[in-house]
Amino acid sequence: MPGLSCRFYQHKFPEVEDVVMVNVRSIAEMGAYVSLLEYNNIEGMILLSELSRRRIRSINKLIRIGRNECVVVIRVDKEKGYIDLSKRRVSPEEAIKCEDKFTKSKTVYSILRHVAEVLEYTKDEQLESLFQRTAWVFDDKYKRPGYGAYDAFKHAVSDPSILDSLDLNEDEREVLINNINRRLTPQAVKIRADIEVACYGYEGIDAVKEALRAGLNCSTENMPIKINLIAPPRYVMTTTTLERTEGLSVLSQAMAVIKEKIEEKRGVFNVQMEPKVVTDTDETELARQMERLERENAEVDGDDDAEEMEAKAED
């Protein structure tokens, strides 16, 4: 299929003060020439004076060809097609929002472009028409370009009727729903943290058990927490959830409860690994590690048994 392309949003040009994602194409004496990724790669320029608040010693340390950058629009001449941009005026918070919006808008774009592939569209105008009848309808409805379409598509995974108001024929609707489900159906993630819990007092074992039990009680129906012993005093905490952020938060809360409980008994609590999403590779490595420790413990137990038998024989 020819490389169909279309801008992400209904407006052909960004507005002044919009923070947009660009890709650096070339660097010249006056500044850097870039492509506005959300606006079908139209050209813009970041003047040298707008690259950094500090004195520029090396332009290559500030900006590199091929890299994506979050920049703010400072001037737009729609007739001549000139767009002036600034990197230095973008705050860290604005950059984070820009990246989030770009990621979600790009997901919507990928879904609709794949729909166009399946339906064998051959012209950019056909892809733009699809945007007009789907993504831009929701962007306009919710007054949130980029986010409106993404949120509506995500909602369509559990309730496809949200697409009923769109001007789509049967084939378009079916292919769109299939692609939305393929790209946006939530995937369960496993979250893990490694901790050390110990208490060397008179009731040390009971204190550790009580603290870990308090952590387990932070489980919810949707986010059950498991705690497994790796090797004293190290434990691994895990939970599986569809909500990554909530999962990280629940595990952090459970760790705080365990810390509080064990320290009440003058015990020790250390974080070996902060809560994080783990991959299958991480899980395989953990299983291998626990297996090895089990074998080592079994060997130690075997040595103890042999020593006991020798002692009895001597008696």
Curated annotation (Swiss-Prot):
Regulation: Activity is regulated by phosphorylation at Ser-49 and Ser-52, which stabilizes the eIF2/GDP/eIF2B complex and prevents the eIF2B-mediated exchange of GDP for GTP, thereby preventing the formation of the 43S pre-initiation complex (43S PIC). This results in the global attenuation of 5' cap-dependent protein synthesis and concomitant translation of ISR-specific mRNAs that contain a short upstream open reading frame (uORF) in their 5' UTR, such as ATF4, ATF5, DDIT3/CHOP and PPP1R15A/GADD34.
Outcome, altering residue 52 to A: Abolished phosphorylation by EIF2AK1/HRI in response to stress. Abolished relocalization to the mitochondrial surface in response to mitochondrial damage
GO molecular function terms listed in the Swiss-Prot or TrEMBL record: ribosome binding; RNA binding; translation initiation factor activity
Modification(s) after translation: Phosphorylation at Ser-49 and Ser-52 stabilizes the eIF-2/GDP/eIF2B complex and prevents GDP/GTP exchange reaction, thus impairing the recycling of eIF-2 between successive rounds of initiation and leading to global inhibition of translation, while concomitantly initiating the preferential translation of integrated stress response (ISR)-specific mRNAs. Substrate for at least 4 kinases: EIF2AK1/HRI, EIF2AK2/PKR, EIF2AK3/PERK and EIF2AK4/GCN2. Phosphorylation on Ser-52 by the EIF2AK4/GCN2 protein kinase occurs in response to amino acid starvation and UV irradiation. (Microbial infection) Phosphorylation by vaccinia virus protein E3 and rotavirus A stabilizes the eIF-2/GDP/eIF2B complex and prevents GDP/GTP exchange reaction, thus impairing the recycling of eIF-2 between successive rounds of initiation and leading to global inhibition of translation.
SMART domains linked: S1 (SM00316)
Keyword presence, DNA repair: no
UniProt cross-references to InterPro entries, sorted A to Z: NA-bd_OB-fold, S1_domain, S1_IF2_alpha, TIF2_asu_C, TIF2_asu_middle_sf, TIF_2_asu
Keywords: Acetylation, Cytoplasm, Initiation factor, Mitochondrion, Phosphoprotein, Protein biosynthesis, RNA-binding, Translation regulation
PTM annotation (Phosphothreonine): residues: 279, 281
This protein's record includes keyword Acetylation: yes
Pfam families for the chain: EIF_2_alpha, S1
Protein family according to the UniProt entry: Belongs to the eIF-2-alpha family.
Functional description taken from the UniProt entry: Member of the eIF2 complex that functions in the early steps of protein synthesis by forming a ternary complex with GTP and initiator tRNA. This complex binds to a 40S ribosomal subunit, followed by mRNA binding to form a 43S pre-initiation complex (43S PIC). Junction of the 60S ribosomal subunit to form the 80S initiation complex is preceded by hydrolysis of the GTP bound to eIF2 and release of an eIF2-GDP binary complex. In order for eIF2 to recycle and catalyze another round of initiation, the GDP bound to eIF2 must exchange with GTP by way of a reaction catalyzed by eIF2B.
Protein name in the entry: Eukaryotic translation initiation factor 2 subunit 1
Native organism: Homo sapiens
Phylogenetic placement of the source organism: Eukaryota, Metazoa, Chordata, Craniata, Vertebrata
